[in-house]
């Protein structure tokens, strides 16, 4: 036997029926399960919320000692079995399950399924996955159910072919976003501008596009939701330029060595005004004539979790290749210069560092890095995740090993995940540090 993991629909149906019969027998001898209990898709297992009894409260009162998180704390570190070229999925799952605010949401049992078929709900499966990974079980988990649901809801990812981790991330966020609201809520679930689900609260930012007429200098502004920022790299077919030639500098804590491109360089290029040229004239809304224009992208609204995607895979009519250029990225990132509200980011397309370094609202901390080793045709995905304070681990499917900060920062980098250092609660407009995560 090849010992490969397979998904069998008939066997799962039998398991569901047997589990259902067992639950009926259990229900006949115990109290009825509340309507607020959470259903685990696939097996129909129900977990009641814990309501403390008087004896339990007395026991807790006599044992007030709190559990301390030490350097050897490993709950949440659990490998994932590769089901056949599924490393692209495993590395994203590790990044998502170590996203502090998303972890807190699922482990506090906040999800209430609104899907007509809960067994097809990807949010329910993610909730189950969080419980599995934080159960303390050290043996690798087999995410067969997650893979099956991905195949159902994102058919372009079905099969055992090699897939792209970035493509999986966007597809997963899209399905999670839709399933948070159920399938019958119409346009609201398809428009992130009118959604307040957990996915949009965490991952959605606002990308502002300003098109300026070269004749009358009228500006047309649009703001689009985004879940990530895709950045061009030097060596690609698109034009790129050194941002600080022949001069050492320090931006966002990055050590800028001549010849080394940084994440800040890529963001500078992303937010630099672009001349659209005579072949792309548009009708100006102010002067009502077709004129040449410039376009500039900035961040109108920053997400709680910022994901940066380096365009390492290039597809053209002539060739398909991987760009292996090393990009230096920092542990802490200040996005203030790239905000639409920062006038400095618009001055001749050149980045000006903010004078007020005490503003922490736009500062981020790195917590996950996804890497791709190998070629475009034959490669493998791994991830680095920040587990507790400055402790980093490398997740390579079922194998998890300790890593140093140097290992993380020296890695090639394909996807970078940053978490806001300061969260603002809209209800009370109170800002507080996310001390639990950082």
Curated annotation (Swiss-Prot):
Residues the record marks as active site: 87, 380
Cell location: Cytoplasm, Cytosol; Nucleus
EC numbers for this chain: 3.4.19.12
PROSITE patterns: USP_1, USP_2, USP_3
Signal peptide: none
Domain USP: 78-421
Keywords from the UniProt entry: Cytoplasm, Disease variant, Hydrolase, Immunity, Innate immunity, Intellectual disability, Nucleus, Protease, Thiol protease, Ubl conjugation pathway
Major location category of this protein: cytoplasm
Alphabetical list of InterPro entries matching this protein: Papain-like_cys_pep_sf, Peptidase_C19_UCH, Ub_carboxyl-term_hydrolase, USP_CS, USP_dom
Effect of residue 87 to S: Abolished deubiquitinase activity; impaired ability to mediate deubiquitination of RIGI
Record's subunit section: Interacts with phosphorylated BCL2L11 isoform BIMEL; this interaction leads to BCL2L11 deubiquitination and stabilization.
Physiological role: Deubiquitinase involved in innate antiviral immunity by mediating deubiquitination of CGAS and RIGI. Negatively regulates RIGI by mediating 'Lys-63'-linked deubiquitination of RIGI, inhibiting type I interferon signaling. Also regulates 'Lys-63'-linked ubiquitination level of MDA5/IFIH1. Acts as a positive regulator of the cGAS-STING pathway by catalyzing 'Lys-48'-linked deubiquitination of CGAS, thereby promoting its stabilization. Can reduce the levels of BCL2L11/BIM ubiquitination and stabilize BCL2L11 in response to the RAF-MAPK-degradation signal.
Protein name as it appears in the record: Ubiquitin carboxyl-terminal hydrolase 27
Organism: Homo sapiens
Taxon lineage: Eukaryota, Metazoa, Chordata, Craniata, Vertebrata
Gene that this polypeptide is encoded by: USP27X
